[in-house]
């Protein structure tokens, strides 16, 4: 799922991610290597919402430009990301699983939800 999402990166698209705490706690090294580096190489802009208590992970990502990061007091049990027509949902509990949906309308709706969350989050 992640490889398909990452391979869709295009410098004309923007990656939007509302993250879950457990993703950083369990998979930080994976995310930096297999997600951030290809995004930077392709010069794809990212907006990332991180739980405030995990600000140290946001500070690590500031070097992976272009990126904008905001911090939220709301912590979610799952995360979602949008790029182009692709949307993923990742549930990272005891039995992690993910959904990847390719649909323009669905992606457009999730982008709007992300923007509402973005406006509520702080720098």
Feature locations, PLM:
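PLD/PLD-like phosphodiesterase catalytic module centered on the HKD motif
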Residues: 22-123
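Interdomain hinge/linker segments and adjacent boundary elements that couple functional modules
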Residues: 1-27, 36
């Amino acid at each position: 799922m992640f490889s398909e999402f990452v391979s869709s990166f295009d410098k004309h698209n923007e990656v939007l991610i509302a993250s879950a705490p457990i993703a950083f706690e369990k998979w930080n090294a994976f995310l930096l290597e297999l997600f951030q580096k290809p995004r930077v190489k392709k010069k794809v802009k990212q907006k990332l919402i991180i739980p405030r208590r995990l600000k140290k992970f946001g500070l690590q990502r500031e070097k992976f430009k272009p990126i904008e990061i905001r911090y939220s007091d709301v912590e979610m049990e799952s995360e979602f990301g949008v790029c182009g027509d692709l949307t993923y949902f990742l549930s990272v509990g005891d039995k992690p699983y993910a959904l990847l949906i390719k649909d323009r309308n669905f992606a457009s709706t999730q982008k709007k939800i992300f923007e509402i969350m973005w406006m509520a989050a702080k720098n």
